[in-house]
Amino acid sequence: MSKTAFPRGIIVVLCVTAGFNPVAHAETAAPIFGDATIQHPLSSDPLILRGMSGGAIPGSKIAGKAETLPTGPCKGFMDEAPDHTVKLTSKFDYLKLVVQSPADTTMIVKGPGGTWCNDDFDGKNPGIVGEWLPGTYQIWIGSYKENESLPYTLKITEGK
């Protein structure tokens, strides 16, 4: 073995290792279908969660009703399991959840005090605002076409 063969091998291994660092890549993008535990005041406002909408279950079946007052109709198709679980460690006098997506989406939230549905809070984007009790909330994001998946961000903010 020549004197130069060993150092070249180390250099190649170091270059390959430096080019592939899954930890660094994982930190740059927010996880899809992430859950959150938050307290008042929010430490990061807005808090952003990402996901893919849709599924095969009608929103009215997830919600157990066709509409919730005053937030709106329980439309769209969703997965059986919630897309996100958000735990509030304290009461929020005002909290806003708004979905942003390139296409029309729907939302269902189940938690302390009931179930809320929404379709077109901000244009074609669903959202729910108001007073929120401490506890665990399950959140579903739906699509109008069965089994259609659409990328979205869920923004959680105390800002009006």
Language-model segments: what does each one mean?
Residues 1-11:
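Bacterial N-terminal signal peptides that target proteins for export
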Residues 27-30, 156-160:
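Intrinsically disordered, low-complexity, charge-dense segments enriched in Lys/Arg
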